[in-house]
Swiss-Prot record:
Record: residues binding S-adenosyl-L-methionine: 168-169, 200, 222-224, 301
Domain of life assignment: Bacteria
Residue stretches making up the Radical SAM core domain: 100-339
Recorded name of the encoding gene: rlmN
EC numbers, comma separated: 2.1.1.192
Cofactor: [4Fe-4S] cluster
Protein's name according to its UniProt entry: Dual-specificity RNA methyltransferase RlmN
InterPro entries cross-referenced by the UniProt entry: Aldolase_TIM, Methyltransferase_A, RlmN_N, RNA_MTrfase_RlmN, rRNA_lsu_MTrfase_RlmN/Cfr, rSAM
Cellular-component GO terms for this entry: cytoplasm
Signal is among the record's keywords: no
Compartment(s) where it occurs, according to its Swiss-Prot or TrEMBL record: Cytoplasm
Cofactor note: Binds 1 [4Fe-4S] cluster. The cluster is coordinated with 3 cysteines and an exchangeable S-adenosyl-L-methionine.
Organism whose genome encodes this protein: Shewanella halifaxensis (strain HAW-EB4)
Length: 373
C-alpha cells in the first residue's frame, strides 16, 4: 500500500517550513508554495513556475493539495449563496457567502453538527458528528474563492471577511481552528486583517483562554439571555460555564487582544416573548456594564420544527432603545439568505438527515472535557 500523501492545506506556514526542512529544502519554499495556493488558487505543482522541477516532482510524490468539494449551492434573491461542502463519508457542512457593496463575508463551519444543543439553532438539532480538519476549514474558503473567481496573476481574492459562525462550536475544535485561522491571517495565506476574521463562541471558557494565548482575532460571544436561569435553557453549555465565568473569560480575552479594539460583539437572538421584554433589556444592560461591547440583536430565523418565533419589529425596537439608554452601541442585524435557510441559526437544512447523531454522553465527554486536555 502506498504511503498516504500529506495534504498541504492541513499545514500552516510554520508546519510547512518544518516539512521543507525535513525534505532537505530551504524553509522559504513554504512562503512560495503558500502564495501559489492561497493567492492564486493553484493546486497543480506543475503550475508553480518559481519552484524548480526537481522540487515540484518531490512535492507531487509526497504531497497533495485537496480541498473538500462543493456538492451544491443555492443563491438567495439578496445575492447570498449557501454552499453544501462534501467533507467525505456522506457528510456535508454548509458555508455561506454574503456579498455587500464594500466587502464580501464568508461564514465558515468548524464541525459537522454541534455538541452544544442550543435550543434555537437548527444545527444543534442534528447533533454532533466530528471536528473538521484544517484542510476542511480553509478548504471552504479556497473552494468558494475559486467558485466566485480568483483574479489570476494579481492575487486578488473575492473574500474580504471570514466569520467562524457556521456549523459547530469553534472552541471545541481548537486543535484545527487555530492553524486554520493562522492561514487566514498569514500574509502568504489568505492575508486577511485580524479585524476581518471573527470567531463566535457560546462560551467554552477554558478554550477561550487558550485562544487568547494563541491568536488575536475579533471575538463575538453568543449571550442570548440576560440571566443564568434562561440561558441554561437556551444555551445549555451555560450549566458548565455560567454567565459570570463566561464574562470573566471575555474580559481576559479583551485584555490580550487588539483585534477587537477594546470590545467584543455580543450576539443576542430575539425570541418572541422569551428573551425580548424591556425588563430583560434592562437586565442585559446591567449584566454587560463591566464588559466593553457592542450588542448585535439578531431577529430569530425560524426553521421547521422550531419551538420559537421571531420577535416583532416593535419588540426589537423597544429592546434596542433600552440598551442604548445605558450607552450601549446596538445593531439590529439585517437578515440575509433566509429564503434559502442560510441565515443565522438556520444552517443544517437537508444535511441533518444525512448526519448521524451521537449519544449525549459522548458529546459532552469527548467534546467538552477531552478536547480541553
Amino acid at each position: 500500500m502506498s504511503e498516504k500523501k500529506i495534504n498541504l492545506l492541513d499545514l500552516d506556514r510554520k508546519a510547512l517550513r518544518v516539512l521543507f526542512t525535513e525534505m532537505g529544502e530551504k524553509p522559504f519554499r513554504a512562503d512560495q508554495l503558500m502564495k501559489w495556493i492561497y493567492h492564486f488558487g493553484v493546486s497543480d505543482f506543475e503550475e508553480m513556475t518559481n519552484i524548480n522541477k526537481v522540487l515540484r516532482a518531490k512535492l507531487a510524490a509526497k504531497c497533495e493539495i485537496v480541498a473538500p468539494e462543493i456538492s451544491s449551492y443555492q443563491k438567495s434573491v439578496d445575492g447570498t449563496i449557501k454552499f453544501a461542502i462534501n467533507v467525505g463519508d456522506g457528510q456535508e457542512v454548509e458555508t455561506v457567502y454574503i456579498p455587500e457593496d464594500d466587502r464580501a463575508t464568508l461564514c465558515v463551519s468548524s464541525q459537522v453538527g454541534c455538541a452544544l444543543e442550543c435550543t434555537f439553532c437548527s444545527t444543534a438539532q442534528q447533533g454532533f458528528n466530528r471536528n473538521l480538519t484544517v484542510a476542511e476549514i480553509v478548504g471552504q474558503i479556497w473552494r468558494v474563492a475559486d467558485f466566485i473567481g480568483f483574479v489570476k496573476d494579481t492575487g486578488e481574492r473575492p473574500i474580504t471577511n471570514v466569520v467562524m459562525m457556521g456549523m459547530g462550536e469553534p472552541l471545541l475544535n481548537l486543535k484545527n481552528v487555530i492553524p486554520a485561522m493562522d492561514i487566514m491571517l498569514d500574509d502568504f495565506g489568505f492575508s486577511l486583517s485580524k479585524r476581518r476574521v471573527t470567531l463566535s463562541t457560546s462560551g467554552v471558557v477554558p478554550a477561550l483562554d487558550k485562544l487568547g494565548d494563541a491568536l488575536d482575532v475579533a471575538l463575538a460571544v453568543s449571550i442570548h439571555a440576560p440571566n443564568d436561569e434562561l440561558r441554561d435553557v437556551l444555551v445549555p453549555v451555560n450549566k458548565k460555564y455560567p454567565l459570570e465565568e463566561f464574562l470573566g473569560g471575555i474580559r481576559r480575552y479583551i485584555a490580550k487582544s487588539n483585534a477587537n479594539r477594546g470590545r467584543v460583539t455580543v450576539e443576542y437572538v430575539m425570541l418572541d416573548h422569551i428573551n425580548d421584554s424591556t425588563d430583560q433589556a434592562h437586565e442585559l444592560a446591567k449584566l454587560m456594564k463591566d464588559t466593553p461591547c457592542k450588542v448585535n440583536l439578531i431577529p430569530f430565523n425560524p426553521y421547521p420544527g422550531s419551538p420559537y418565533g421571531r420577535s416583532s419589529n416593535s419588540r426589537i425596537d423597544r429592546f434596542s432603545k433600552v440598551l442604548m439608554e445605558y450607552g450601549l452601541t446596538v445593531i439590529v442585524r439585517k437578515t440575509r439568505g433566509d429564503d434559502i435557510d442560510a441565515a443565522c441559526g438556520q444552517l443544517a437544512g437537508d444535511i441533518r438527515d444525512r448526519t448521524k447523531r451521537l449519544a449525549k454522553k459522548q458529546m459532552q465527554e469527548s467534546q467538552i472535557s477531552v478536547t480541553m486536555n
